Structure formats: C-alpha cells, structure tokens
C-alpha cells in the first residue's frame, strides 16, 4: 500500500468554526516533515504522543480535507480519510460500495450513477489491512503531512474520531454487513481504540435486513451510532428528492424500529429545488415524522440539519444560505423539541 511523496508545506486555516474535543485519544507534537518511501510502513514514522490540547481545536470549512470528501485514497479500495464537521475531526470512511450500488438516486448526490456499477463481494481481509494501515499512518502523523491534510493542525489528523460506513452507495446493501462491522471492531480493539465510535451512515432502507440488524447490534457494543437519512415528510417529496423505488413507509418503519432499540441520529439535507426551498407544509410534515418516531417509542439523539456542500448532478438543486438553514433548524426545534445541529 503506497504513501507516495508527502508534501511539507503547512497552510493557514480559515473559515467557519466547529469545536473539536478529545475525550479519548492524545494529540502529538508537530511531526518533522519527511519524504516517505512508497514501501515504507507507517510504524517507521511513529512519533511520541503528547497531552490533549487544552484549547479545543476548530474545524474550518475551507480546509482541503473538509471540502474534498473523495472516497479514493492511494491505491485502496475500501478505506479513505476525511475531516468531517459532523464527526468534528478525522473520520475514517469504509466504502463498502466501490461498485456505486445504491437504492437511492438523490438529486444532490455527487456520485456518478450514469454508468451502473457492477456488484461485488466485500473482501474482508482487504478492509482489515487497509484500515490497519491507515490508522497507523494517522496516529504516526504521516497523514497530516499529505497535501490534502497539511492545512489543518497536525493533531486533527492524528485523532481518529470515528470509523464510518459511508461511501459511494448504501452500506446496508452488502450481504455481509455484520462481518464488516466485526472486522472494524477487531481492528479498533487491536489498535487500542476500543472507545472510538463506529458509525453507520444510511438511507435506512436496509435496516430491517437480518445481517444489518446483527451488525448494528454489534456496533451497539462498540460505541456505535446510526446516522439515518430523512429528507422528506411526504411520499411525494421523498420521490422528488431521493428518487427511490423503496416505499417511504418502509423507511419510516425502519427508522422507528431501529430507534426503539438504541438512540439514533437523523441526518437531513435541506435544499432549494428550482429556486424554492422546502415548503412550510412539507417541513411541518417532516417534523411530524420525527414526532411519530418519538411517540412510537423511538429515541432520537439529535438532528443533523445540513445543506449542499459540493456540486450536484442536477443544476436545479441548490444550497440554502446559512440564514435559511438556521430558520429551518429553528422550526424543527420548535415543533419537536429535539436538539438540532446546523451544518451550513
């Protein structure tokens, strides 16, 4: 697995701020820039880890690894690093769908689905090896020296905030999701990161599958979190935005049943279509769905309200301003009483 040549420059960060706390891992002293052989192991770069920073780090919208969430890293197939505002730092993604298989075709998704991908089985040994290597590379300080990450403080890319099943499609579509979770949990334990979260970012369509239920139960034992999509309040708007053949009532049922077992996070993208934001009637219906989940015995940890951050395949799908997103979030708070985090 290759490292390539690591750039040495460190830029000045700027942009919106989000707090980064460090409850588990320790930060490092600034590593000495160096060029790494293509065949070097990250263990050869291990540097001593220092105390956690006393002042919280901020995640800035303009950092390259925040702007660019490409699911391709080096010559890997499954594993990739990003700096995530929602994770508040380094998130290691596990892309179980390099074939781009998905049961949604959201108007805002940047994944190219004009040429359908070819389904293939997930190679668990390769997931394990890629994840081991990338964790070592991050903890050693090597990741922070790469061009995509060198405009952020070094400690940001040395603290693994979570490992997230997320990528070019829907993670729950694979047949062995539970085995994938087991691989990730074992690697985290092996690397001394047993307290690090395992996150499933999902459109919720597959949460009723037996292997997925087993996998999510295993996540529960390893500080797992389910971040589940809900972008609509009505079937009509759901079809318009998510463009899926999966019935909307199945999505709602899966959300409810999953939230009855453990608290879940709702992730909702709000946007304009043909210049118009979600109508007040649709937003009220959306809030009603959240209340139905809670009234039905489900627990919602919080809502992540966000808008477009990257180019979309549909020119008529455009982002909300920060003020418009805040107004949406305030309506959700008022109508549901839930905690809502905004990511403009």
Name these PLM-found stretches.
Residues 173-318:
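Conserved AdoMet/S-adenosylmethionine-binding subsite of the radical SAM
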Residues 108-115, 162-165, 264-269, 307-309:
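A short small-residue
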Residues 1-2, 7, 11, 18-25, ...:
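Auxiliary Fe-S-binding modules of radical SAM enzymes
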Residues 121, 125, 245, 319-326:
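Short, conserved loop/turn and helix-capping segments at secondary-structure boundaries
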Residues 46-99, 105-107, 113-121, 126-129, ...:
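N-terminal [4Fe-4S]-dependent radical SAM core
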Residues 111-222:
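Conserved Radical SAM active-site core
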Residues 91-95, 164, 199, 227:
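Short aromatic/hydrophobic contact patches that present stacked aromatics
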């Amino acid at each position: 697995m290759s490292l390539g040549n690591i750039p040495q420059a460190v830029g000045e960060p700027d942009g919106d701020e989000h707090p980064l706390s460090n409850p588990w891992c320790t930060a490092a002293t600034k590593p000495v820039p160096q060029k790494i052989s293509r065949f070097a192991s990250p263990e050869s770069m291990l540097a001593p880890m220092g105390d956690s920073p006393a002042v919280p780090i901020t995640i800035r919208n303009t950092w390259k690894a925040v702007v660019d969430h490409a699911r391709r890293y080096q010559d890997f197939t499954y594993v990739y690093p990003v700096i995530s505002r929602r994770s508040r730092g380094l998130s290691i993604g596990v892309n179980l769908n390099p074939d781009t298989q998905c049961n949604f075709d959201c108007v805002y998704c940047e994944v190219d689905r004009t040429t359908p991908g070819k389904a293939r089985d997930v190679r668990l040994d390769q997931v394990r090896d890629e994840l081991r290597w990338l964790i070592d590379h991050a903890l050693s300080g090597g990741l922070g020296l790469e061009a995509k990450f060198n405009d952020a403080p070094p400690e940001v890319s040395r603290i693994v905030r979570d490992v997230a099943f997320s990528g070019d499609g829907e993670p729950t579509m694979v047949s062995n999701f539970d085995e994938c979770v087991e691989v990730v949990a074992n690697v985290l334990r092996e690397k001394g990161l047993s307290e690090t979260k395992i996150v499933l970012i999902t459109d919720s369509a597959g949460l009723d599958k037996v292997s997925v239920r087993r996998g999510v139960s295993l996540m529960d034992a390893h500080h797992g979190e389910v971040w589940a999509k809900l972008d609509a309040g009505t079937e009509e708007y759901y079809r318009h935005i998510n463009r899926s053949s999966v019935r909307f009532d199945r999505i709602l049922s899966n959300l409810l049943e999953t939230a009855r077992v453990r608290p879940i996070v709702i992730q909702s993208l709000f946007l304009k279509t043909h210049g118009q934001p979600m109508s007040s009637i649709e937003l009220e219906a959306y809030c009603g769905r959240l209340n139905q989940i809670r009234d039905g015995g489900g627990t919602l940890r919080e809502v992540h309200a966000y808008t477009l951050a990257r180019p979309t395949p549909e020119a008529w799908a455009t982002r909300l301003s920060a003020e418009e997103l805040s107004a949406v979030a305030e309506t959700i708070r008022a109508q549901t009483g839930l905690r809502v985090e905004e990511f403009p």
